[in-house]
């Protein structure tokens, strides 16, 4: 089974332009993500997908495989689908380019989750961390995931769901790492972006809004997503 890890990287970011090439301890952030990803035992091949010449030049200069994509993709997974048209694989991983501390074990866990889920007819998988901190509950940049008893996803939200009306329940934090079957990924850009995806800016909601199931697996905390210059300082 060929597992292709794709790291989407774009220059244009509202809150932090050019962040893929921002240095962390002397090395570009995208390079840190690459180094973590290639350590995953499940990954057969890794590529960086970008629409920016500056990022592509850095990759080529540092022997990181890069694929140029269109600049019109609304999400990283849409960009991934273009890569899938160019490189064939059985499983595609969307490894966020702003997760320099992503654990290889997390990547392997999501891959294994998808492989098992495909036997149940589920073609997309992701991960979550059990137990949100107080700071995460108040942070709209944090996405929360509500898991079902059967290991699938009920919903995602930037609100700290579920609301504890009757009793307290532990909230979970979504880890922005996705695994797709080839068929599911190629289908992704053909699906209309629904109102919840647009409102919450959570790309994987597109599958749920169209009635498709998503498998999920709990993983250990450890990674820090870089959305702002302050996050970069925290990672260092």
Residue ranges of each PLM-predicted region?
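N-terminal glycine-rich phosphate-binding loop and ensuing alpha1 helix
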Residues: 2-49
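Hydrophobic/aromatic residues located in beta-strands of well-ordered beta-sheets
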Residues: 5, 46-48, 92, 124-125, ...
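Conserved alpha/beta core of the MobA/IspD/sugar-nucleotide pyrophosphorylase nucleotidyltransferase superfamily
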Residues: 169-236
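Short phosphate-binding loop-to-helix
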Residues: 47, 53-112
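Short, high-confidence coil segments that cap the C-terminus of an alpha-helix
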Residues: 43, 89, 119-122, 212
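A structural signal for short hydrophobic beta-strand segments in well-ordered beta-sheet cores
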Residues: 21, 145-147, 216
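Conserved core of the sugar-phosphate nucleotidyltransferase
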Residues: 102-194
């Amino acid at each position: 089974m060929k597992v292709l890890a794709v790291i989407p990287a774009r220059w244009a970011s509202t809150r932090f332009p050019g962040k893929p090439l921002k240095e962390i301890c002397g090395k570009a952030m995208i390079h840190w993500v690459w180094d973590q990803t290639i350590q995953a035992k499940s990954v057969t091949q890794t590529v960086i997908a970008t629409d920016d010449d500056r990022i592509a030049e850095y990759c080529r200069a540092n022997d990181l495989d890069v694929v140029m994509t269109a600049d019109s993709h609304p999400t990283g997974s849409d960009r991934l689908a273009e890569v899938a048209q160019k490189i064939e694989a059985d499983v595609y991983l969307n490894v966020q380019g702003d997760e320099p501390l992503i654990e290889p074990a997390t990547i392997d866990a999501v891959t294994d989750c998808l492989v098992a889920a495909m036997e149940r007819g589920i073609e997309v998988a992701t991960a979550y961390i059990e137990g949100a901190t107080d700071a995460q509950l108040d942070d709209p940049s944090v996405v929360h995931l509500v898991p079902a008893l059967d290991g699938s996803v009920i919903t995602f939200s930037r609100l700290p769901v579920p609301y504890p009306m009757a009793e307290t329940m532990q909230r979970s934090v979504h880890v922005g790492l996705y695994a797709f079957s080839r068929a599911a990924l190629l289908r992704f850009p053909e699906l209309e972006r629904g109102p919840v995806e647009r409102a919450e800016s959570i790309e994987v909601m597109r599958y749920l809004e169209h009635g498709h199931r998503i498998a999920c697996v709990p993983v250990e905390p450890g990674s820090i997503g870089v959305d702002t210059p302050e996050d970069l300082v925290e990672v260092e």
